[in-house]
From Swiss-Prot:
Its main location: plastid. Keywords: 4Fe-4S, Chlorophyll, Chloroplast, Chromophore, Electron transport, Iron, Iron-sulfur, Magnesium, Membrane, Metal-binding, Oxidoreductase, Photosynthesis, Photosystem I, Plastid, Thylakoid, Transmembrane, Transmembrane helix, Transport. P700 is a chlorophyll a/chlorophyll a' dimer, A0 is one or more chlorophyll a, A1 is one or both phylloquinones and FX is a shared 4Fe-4S iron-sulfur center. The gene is psaB. Its EC number is 1.97.1.12. GO terms for molecular function: 4 iron, 4 sulfur cluster binding; chlorophyll binding; electron transfer activity; magnesium ion binding; oxidoreductase activity. GO terms for cellular component: chloroplast thylakoid membrane; photosystem I. This is Photosystem I P700 chlorophyll a apoprotein A2. It catalyses: reduced [plastocyanin] + hnu + oxidized [2Fe-2S]-[ferredoxin] = oxidized [plastocyanin] + reduced [2Fe-2S]-[ferredoxin]. Chlorophyll a B1 binds at H654.
Amino acid sequence: MASRFPKFSQGLAQDPTTRRIWFGIATAHDFESHDDMTEEKLYQKIFASHFGQLAIIFLWTSGNLFHVAWQGNFEAWSQDPLHIRPIAHAIWDPHFGQPAVEAYTRGGASGPVNISYSGVYQWWYTIGLRTNQDLYTGSLFLLGLAAVALVAGWLHLQPKWKPSVSWFKNAESRLNHHLSGLFGVSSLAWTGHLIHVAIPEARGQHVRWDNFLSVAPHPQGLAPFFAGQWGVYAQDPDSSSHLFGTAQGSGTAILTFLGGFHPQTQSLWLTDIAHHHLAIAVLFIVAGHMYRTNFGIGHSMKEILEAHVPPGGGLGRGHQGLYDTVNNSLHFQLGLALACLGVITSLVAQHIYSLPPYAFLAQDFTTQAALYTHHQYIAGFIMTGAFAHGAIFFIRDYNPEQNKGNVLARMLEHKEAIISHLSWASLFLGFHTLGLYVHNDVMLAFGTPEKQILIEPVFAQWIQSSHGKTLYGFDVLLSSSSSIALNAGKSLWLPGWLDAINNNSNSLFLTIGPGDFLVHHAIALGLHTTTLILVKGALDARGSKLMPDKKEFGFSFPCDGPGRGGTCDISAYDAFYLAVFWMLNTIGWVTFYWHWKHLGLWQGNVAQFNESSTYLMGWLRDYLWLNSSQLINGYNPFGMNSLSVWAWMFLFGHLVWATGFMFLISWRGYWQELIETLAWAHERTPLANLVRWKDKPVALSIVQARLVGLAHFSVGYIFTYAAFLIASTSGKFG
């Protein structure tokens, strides 16, 4: 008999129902649960799959470069970045009638095209690419890299090339290599690219492989480096009248500490960015030589952790036992990695608009909105994933004996206190914030707006002032003309910072008021509630008062029947599932706030946000309803326009989102009856009944239906907001 899917589970392969297919897909990546899985095989499989992941990433980025080179307008855009719209790729659609062809023929193209809102044009332009040939070269290089990654993945599954478990668990060597090699050397290489290629290109000097070795990036070459006069590299920076991409107004400095933005491109100075990467490189290369490997010098992670026992005894055995716990648990490591990556991704969202690194990005409003929203949603999914794997760690990998009395055990021992404090914070934030919004809403409705409760965020304003924002008149630290910090800083560091922070044409330290105070606390409510659900899910994953043996049921059980007072909705999976809704909700508030605040800034009408954001109807009417008008106007009695794709996607997103509820609300019995009725009809319909299937159709399990429902909810939610965001922004600013 031919082997049936899934090969990794004989038990499942023999299941006579359609559960075999769905459950097979669901557990395909849960390597730990597969037949004949050993620790060694597990590590090797994951290691090899990383190369596959890299290959996919390189192929994708290669495709971006290739399509822009083939169908885009990069060379034309480079000549006039502020007035030509960047093209992502052509649209070939046989359904397009003449009005559609006309509506989507933009950016100087000869046929219908998609406009790029990803920021890749600005990025490629900033790092020194100028021609389609450059893009093709990059695309081919990445394609080659993808092929190399695939070969490497295959190679490391061959018997002679499989690394051993001890190699995977050698934490110090891995730390050294990742710190020095991955972060350090790559940052150094990037500094090299910026200094040798990007900065000369920004000054009108074209450096490629043919003249790479003959053009010195600095007039004095390496002489100041060896003479120890490094300050020479910071002398003569580009002037404020510098035209990016030309020699006009350019200087010779390569490593600066100017602060602020290039006046024309409104982006960070390239010489500042090079300096930053050089500093990071030095830091990480040094850090990558700190841990003890074969040479008997340096730190041992285990010794450091074992020594971390607070002397007063107030924290028990401190970090003892943590080294082996972390080093032997892939879920713990993945949880830590996801937590870090999630925070970094959210920081990218924040910094890409407040300190734009790419030339002319700040003037491309739709791209800024898209990049911010994209990175915040990605961050949300990654962060919730960190807690999911934390919970799986507690169920599968946590050993109470090994961790007796240390910080991990103590977290579990006083989890009630942690959970109840988080619960209290969430309740406090929720009731007070909603109370203020509702009060203000009623006052507006009754025609007495002066009776609103409006609270100035004085502490946040004070912090902004201490960083140099003079608007509020606090006269403190960098915003005080008599401050030592200010006077010392003028000549020493970041002379451009104070100009930037007090300039209203950028997004650095936005002016804040009562509307910001309220929405800040609404977001804080969302963050605390999401965290509460995730933390409770992880800390109760092994067991709770209601269900002490929860660990035996695994990560994703639906119920254990009505005994014990009802045990549905209490698995670690259920907590994760609920938290994702809260995460999406919270990031909704974050992106609404960011977008509305910036629409006012970009349109020169900050009063609208300030006046309308203090009550609920203001958000519903003056943000959501008002800005959806262009969207709904994609198709109208006069035909269609280039917003029609977003109008359609807006409706389609709502459809997908609403489909989610069908899976989230109805129960298994309903589906089982429906499926049996459909199967009955199929078997009795001529022609259709020639097609048979071997598996007996059964409804999805409760857990699977939840996953399908959640997936539709998430995808629909994000599709809907993406369409709204891009249409409302591009409709206003082109």
